[in-house]
Structure formats: structure tokens, C-alpha cells
Regions:
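Flexible, low-complexity linker and terminal segments
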Residues: 60-170
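Thiamine diphosphate
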Residues: 1-78
Length: 170
């Protein structure tokens, strides 16, 4: 699913539920932010909306990294059954870069719906358990950057570190 930050406002209600309900397949939300704003009605930071919705966010610093992060986001979503946001900003969205396109394997999942009120019924009785499961998913996802080479700089040395994301990290 793709949208700009203003579209995320419209999609906020189903987004909040999607994290609790989880997904049965990979679900990547690309939400383009516009710091400034240069080409949007408002300036927003969708990372705050993702934090509120309790979903992970990947913040690419270039078109090439955005392409790489799409695969990471899909794998993360599949592994943890949760929506994952990729958040490029204006400078990434309005730039070009050569990337190597990979073959996309055909999907193998089938569309089926199994009645499961404990998962799909939006009632307080079931939501509490889903909340606990979501918090557990997020704890496991928090360890993910340690195993993702794209998110680390192996050439870094020294006793101090600057943590940055997106274009500021480039």
C-alpha cells in the first residue's frame, strides 16, 4: 500500500487495528513524508503515527536503500505477521538511482478465511490478549537491526556513535 503522509491520516483507523489483528501475509506500507513541506499540504512525521500504531518503520536514505528495505520490510512482515512501514522522505522520493531489480517469485499463499473470533472480533475480551501478543512481537522485532547488515556500518570505529536515519544518515 502506498500513500503520502496526508493519506496516512485517512488510513489511520484501519492501520491502528491492523497491527493488533496482524496479517496473514506480508503487508508493507510505503508512506512518503515531506519535511518542509515542499510538495504537500502539511508537514508530518509518519514515524510518530507508526509508533502510535505499534508497527516497525524503516527509513531509507537513498532510492537504492529504499529498494533494499522493501524486501526487508516484506520479510519482517511475513515473519512477525505485522504491517511494516517504509518511510522515504522528499529527497529520496524525488531522486533517481540505478538499482538492480531482482526476480520476484510468484506468491504461494491462497486466499482463505478461517472463523476465529479470538483474532478477528474487535471486543475488549480478545483485544487484551492481542495487545500482549503485539507487545511480544515488537520485542522480537527490536532485536532485528543486530542481524541486518544494511542497518549497520561495519567500518565504524571509535568510542562515540551518531545515530541517524533517512537522508540525514547518508
Amino acid at each position: 500500500v502506498s500513500m503520502k503522509q496526508v493519506g496516512l491520516n485517512v488510513a489511520s483507523d484501519p492501520l491502528m487495528s491492523a497491527a493488533y489483528l496482524g496479517t496473514k501475509s506480508g503487508f508493507v506500507l510505503i508512506c512518503a513524508d515531506d519535511p518542509g513541506p515542499h510538495s504537500s499540504q502539511t508537514e508530518q512525521d509518519s514515524r510518530l503515527m507508526a509508533m502510535f500504531a505499534k508497527i516497525p518503520v524503516l527509513d531509507p536514505d537513498s532510492p537504492r536503500q529504499a529498494k533494499e528495505m522493501m524486501g526487508m520490510a516484506y520479510a519482517l512482515s511475513e515473519a512477525h505477521q505485522i504491517p511494516v512501514m517504509v518511510r522515504p522522505t522528499t529527497r529520496v522520493c524525488h531522486s533517481r538511482q540505478d538499482v538492480v531489480a531482482a526476480e520476484i517469485p510468484p506468491g504461494t499463499s491462497t486466499a482463505d478465511f478461517k472463523k476465529d473470533p479470538a483474532r478477528w472480533a474487535a471486543t475488549p475480551k480478545f483485544r487484551y490478549q492481542l495487545h500482549l501478543e503485539l507487545e511480544d512481537k515488537l520485542a522480537h522485532i527490536a532485536a532485528y537491526p543486530d542481524s541486518a547488515p544494511i542497518l549497520r556500518n561495519p567500518d565504524a570505529t571509535g568510542r562515540r556513535v551518531v545515530v541517524a536515519s533517512g537522508v540525514a544518515a547518508a
